[in-house]
Amino acid sequence: MNEDLLFELDDVSKEYVMGEVKVKALSSASFGIGRGELAVVLGPSGSGKSTLLNALGGMDIPSSGKIYFNGIDISSYTEKQLTNYRRKNIGFVFQFYNLMPNLTARENVELATEISENPLDIPEVLERIGLKDRGDHFPAQMSGGEQQRVAIARAIAKNPEVLLCDEPTGALDYTTGVKVLLLLRQINREMGKTVVIITHNQPIAQMADRVIRIRSGEIVENRLNHVPVDPGKIEW
Protein backbone atom coordinates (compact mmCIF):
# COMPACT_ATOMS: atom_id res chain seq x y z
CA MET A 1 0.00 0.00 0.00
CA ASN A 2 1.09 3.56 -0.75
CA GLU A 3 0.87 5.46 2.55
CA ASP A 4 0.30 8.78 0.74
CA LEU A 5 -2.92 7.47 -0.80
CA LEU A 6 -6.20 7.80 1.07
CA PHE A 7 -8.09 5.69 -1.48
CA GLU A 8 -6.54 2.93 -3.55
CA LEU A 9 -8.58 0.86 -6.00
CA ASP A 10 -7.22 -2.43 -7.27
CA ASP A 11 -8.91 -3.90 -10.36
CA VAL A 12 -12.41 -2.88 -9.22
CA SER A 13 -15.39 -3.94 -11.34
CA LYS A 14 -19.11 -3.58 -10.73
CA GLU A 15 -21.85 -5.45 -12.59
CA TYR A 16 -25.58 -5.00 -12.27
CA VAL A 17 -27.98 -7.72 -13.38
CA MET A 18 -31.19 -6.45 -14.97
CA GLY A 19 -33.30 -9.46 -15.84
CA GLU A 20 -31.15 -11.52 -18.19
CA VAL A 21 -28.88 -8.59 -19.01
CA LYS A 22 -25.61 -7.83 -17.23
CA VAL A 23 -24.51 -4.21 -17.19
CA LYS A 24 -20.88 -3.51 -16.37
CA ALA A 25 -20.81 -0.09 -14.70
CA LEU A 26 -17.12 -0.28 -13.71
CA SER A 27 -14.46 -2.30 -15.48
CA SER A 28 -11.11 -3.12 -13.83
CA ALA A 29 -10.66 0.33 -12.27
CA SER A 30 -7.24 0.81 -10.67
CA PHE A 31 -6.12 4.19 -9.32
CA GLY A 32 -5.43 6.11 -6.15
CA ILE A 33 -6.46 9.42 -4.57
CA GLY A 34 -3.97 11.12 -2.28
CA ARG A 35 -4.70 12.26 1.25
CA GLY A 36 -5.71 15.94 1.24
CA GLU A 37 -6.16 16.14 -2.52
CA LEU A 38 -8.97 17.80 -4.40
CA ALA A 39 -9.78 15.24 -7.08
CA VAL A 40 -12.18 15.63 -9.99
CA VAL A 41 -13.68 12.53 -11.59
CA LEU A 42 -14.76 13.53 -15.07
CA GLY A 43 -17.01 11.67 -17.48
CA PRO A 44 -20.22 11.87 -19.52
CA SER A 45 -23.61 10.69 -18.31
CA GLY A 46 -23.72 6.92 -17.92
CA SER A 47 -19.93 6.55 -17.78
CA GLY A 48 -19.89 5.00 -14.30
CA LYS A 49 -19.11 8.12 -12.24
CA SER A 50 -21.92 7.66 -9.73
CA THR A 51 -21.15 3.95 -9.38
CA LEU A 52 -17.58 4.90 -8.58
CA LEU A 53 -18.69 7.47 -6.01
CA ASN A 54 -21.01 4.94 -4.37
CA ALA A 55 -18.14 2.47 -4.17
CA LEU A 56 -15.78 5.03 -2.59
CA GLY A 57 -18.50 6.04 -0.15
CA GLY A 58 -19.34 2.52 0.96
CA MET A 59 -22.84 2.74 -0.50
CA ASP A 60 -22.13 -0.17 -2.82
CA ILE A 61 -19.60 -3.00 -2.88
CA PRO A 62 -17.69 -4.03 -6.01
CA SER A 63 -18.40 -7.27 -7.84
CA SER A 64 -14.66 -7.91 -7.88
CA GLY A 65 -11.45 -6.15 -6.91
CA LYS A 66 -10.54 -4.28 -3.75
CA ILE A 67 -11.00 -0.75 -2.41
CA TYR A 68 -8.57 0.39 0.27
CA PHE A 69 -9.21 3.36 2.56
CA ASN A 70 -6.22 4.33 4.70
CA GLY A 71 -4.76 0.96 3.79
CA ILE A 72 -7.80 -1.01 4.97
CA ASP A 73 -9.84 -3.13 2.55
CA ILE A 74 -13.39 -1.77 2.83
CA SER A 75 -14.67 -3.94 -0.02
CA SER A 76 -14.78 -6.90 2.38
CA TYR A 77 -16.74 -5.00 5.05
CA THR A 78 -20.07 -6.20 6.40
CA GLU A 79 -23.12 -3.91 6.14
CA LYS A 80 -22.60 -2.82 9.74
CA GLN A 81 -18.95 -2.02 9.09
CA LEU A 82 -19.88 -0.05 5.96
CA THR A 83 -22.43 1.96 7.93
CA ASN A 84 -19.79 2.83 10.53
CA TYR A 85 -17.32 3.67 7.75
CA ARG A 86 -19.79 6.11 6.13
CA ARG A 87 -20.73 7.72 9.43
CA LYS A 88 -17.18 8.28 10.57
CA ASN A 89 -15.30 9.06 7.37
CA ILE A 90 -17.56 10.24 4.56
CA GLY A 91 -19.56 13.41 3.94
CA PHE A 92 -21.86 13.31 0.91
CA VAL A 93 -22.91 16.31 -1.19
CA PHE A 94 -25.59 15.69 -3.82
CA GLN A 95 -26.73 17.56 -6.92
CA PHE A 96 -30.22 18.25 -5.55
CA TYR A 97 -29.17 18.97 -1.94
CA ASN A 98 -31.36 16.27 -0.28
CA LEU A 99 -32.28 18.55 2.63
CA MET A 100 -35.16 17.79 4.99
CA PRO A 101 -37.81 20.37 3.94
CA ASN A 102 -39.47 20.55 7.37
CA LEU A 103 -36.19 21.34 9.16
CA THR A 104 -34.34 24.66 9.28
CA ALA A 105 -30.83 25.01 7.92
CA ARG A 106 -29.40 24.64 11.42
CA GLU A 107 -31.54 21.58 12.14
CA ASN A 108 -30.47 19.95 8.86
CA VAL A 109 -26.85 20.40 9.89
CA GLU A 110 -27.51 19.20 13.45
CA LEU A 111 -28.98 16.00 12.05
CA ALA A 112 -25.57 14.96 10.73
CA THR A 113 -23.75 15.72 13.98
CA GLU A 114 -25.97 13.31 15.91
CA ILE A 115 -24.18 10.36 14.30
CA SER A 116 -20.69 11.79 14.70
CA GLU A 117 -18.12 10.95 17.36
CA ASN A 118 -16.31 14.26 16.90
CA PRO A 119 -18.66 16.86 15.34
CA LEU A 120 -17.71 20.43 14.54
CA ASP A 121 -19.35 23.45 16.17
CA ILE A 122 -22.52 24.18 14.17
CA PRO A 123 -22.47 28.02 14.45
CA GLU A 124 -18.84 27.96 13.27
CA VAL A 125 -19.75 25.72 10.33
CA LEU A 126 -22.65 27.98 9.30
CA GLU A 127 -20.34 30.99 9.49
CA ARG A 128 -17.69 29.23 7.42
CA ILE A 129 -20.16 28.59 4.61
CA GLY A 130 -21.48 32.16 4.76
CA LEU A 131 -24.94 31.39 6.21
CA LYS A 132 -24.61 32.32 9.88
CA ASP A 133 -27.69 34.58 9.62
CA ARG A 134 -29.79 31.99 7.75
CA GLY A 135 -29.74 29.17 10.28
CA ASP A 136 -33.43 29.55 11.15
CA HIS A 137 -34.61 29.55 7.53
CA PHE A 138 -36.22 26.54 5.88
CA PRO A 139 -34.98 25.16 2.53
CA ALA A 140 -38.00 26.59 0.68
CA GLN A 141 -36.95 30.07 1.85
CA MET A 142 -33.47 29.69 0.39
CA SER A 143 -31.98 29.88 -3.10
CA GLY A 144 -30.48 26.83 -4.77
CA GLY A 145 -26.98 28.04 -3.97
CA GLU A 146 -27.86 28.56 -0.32
CA GLN A 147 -29.41 25.10 -0.11
CA GLN A 148 -26.26 23.58 -1.56
CA ARG A 149 -24.20 25.46 1.04
CA VAL A 150 -26.39 23.97 3.77
CA ALA A 151 -25.84 20.54 2.21
CA ILE A 152 -22.08 21.13 2.31
CA ALA A 153 -22.32 22.33 5.92
CA ARG A 154 -24.23 19.16 6.79
CA ALA A 155 -21.50 17.09 5.15
CA ILE A 156 -18.58 18.73 6.97
CA ALA A 157 -20.29 19.20 10.36
CA LYS A 158 -19.76 15.58 11.34
CA ASN A 159 -16.04 16.15 10.67
CA PRO A 160 -15.40 13.44 8.05
CA GLU A 161 -12.07 12.83 6.40
CA VAL A 162 -13.57 12.95 2.90
CA LEU A 163 -16.23 14.91 1.02
CA LEU A 164 -17.76 13.03 -1.93
CA CYS A 165 -19.62 15.48 -4.17
CA ASP A 166 -21.93 14.18 -6.91
CA GLU A 167 -22.43 16.91 -9.55
CA PRO A 168 -22.50 19.65 -6.86
CA THR A 169 -22.97 22.44 -9.42
CA GLY A 170 -25.31 20.52 -11.73
CA ALA A 171 -28.51 22.26 -10.58
CA LEU A 172 -26.94 25.73 -10.26
CA ASP A 173 -26.32 28.65 -12.58
CA TYR A 174 -22.72 29.56 -13.45
CA THR A 175 -22.19 32.29 -10.85
CA THR A 176 -23.67 30.24 -8.02
CA GLY A 177 -21.80 27.15 -9.18
CA VAL A 178 -18.47 28.97 -9.00
CA LYS A 179 -19.25 30.08 -5.43
CA VAL A 180 -19.89 26.45 -4.46
CA LEU A 181 -16.61 25.36 -6.07
CA LEU A 182 -14.76 28.13 -4.20
CA LEU A 183 -16.29 26.86 -0.96
CA LEU A 184 -15.26 23.27 -1.69
CA ARG A 185 -11.71 24.40 -2.44
CA GLN A 186 -11.66 26.41 0.79
CA ILE A 187 -12.75 23.33 2.76
CA ASN A 188 -10.02 21.33 1.06
CA ARG A 189 -7.24 23.86 1.57
CA GLU A 190 -8.13 25.29 4.98
CA MET A 191 -9.66 22.26 6.71
CA GLY A 192 -7.46 19.63 5.10
CA LYS A 193 -10.37 17.55 3.87
CA THR A 194 -9.94 15.28 0.87
CA VAL A 195 -12.56 16.40 -1.66
CA VAL A 196 -13.74 14.28 -4.60
CA ILE A 197 -15.97 16.00 -7.15
CA ILE A 198 -17.88 13.89 -9.67
CA THR A 199 -18.89 15.91 -12.74
CA HIS A 200 -19.56 15.85 -16.47
CA ASN A 201 -18.46 19.50 -16.70
CA GLN A 202 -14.96 19.40 -18.19
CA PRO A 203 -13.74 22.91 -17.23
CA ILE A 204 -14.14 22.05 -13.52
CA ALA A 205 -11.18 19.68 -13.88
CA GLN A 206 -8.92 22.74 -14.08
CA MET A 207 -9.29 23.31 -10.30
CA ALA A 208 -8.24 19.78 -9.37
CA ASP A 209 -5.02 18.47 -7.86
CA ARG A 210 -5.86 15.16 -9.52
CA VAL A 211 -7.95 14.50 -12.63
CA ILE A 212 -9.53 11.09 -13.20
CA ARG A 213 -11.39 10.49 -16.46
CA ILE A 214 -13.87 7.66 -16.81
CA ARG A 215 -15.50 6.44 -20.02
CA SER A 216 -17.86 3.47 -20.36
CA GLY A 217 -16.84 2.23 -16.93
CA GLU A 218 -13.11 2.34 -17.65
CA ILE A 219 -10.55 4.70 -16.13
CA VAL A 220 -8.87 6.27 -19.17
CA GLU A 221 -6.80 8.88 -17.35
CA ASN A 222 -5.47 9.47 -13.83
CA ARG A 223 -3.05 12.38 -13.62
CA LEU A 224 -1.83 15.04 -11.24
CA ASN A 225 -2.49 18.67 -12.11
CA HIS A 226 0.48 20.63 -10.80
CA VAL A 227 -1.03 24.06 -11.51
CA PRO A 228 -4.68 24.06 -10.33
CA VAL A 229 -6.74 27.02 -11.54
CA ASP A 230 -8.68 29.22 -9.12
CA PRO A 231 -12.38 28.27 -9.48
CA GLY A 232 -13.20 31.97 -9.91
CA LYS A 233 -11.27 31.94 -13.20
CA ILE A 234 -12.98 28.87 -14.65
CA GLU A 235 -15.63 29.43 -17.31
CA TRP A 236 -18.19 27.08 -18.82
Outline where the language-model segments fall.
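ABC family nucleotide-binding domain
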Residues: 5-214, 219
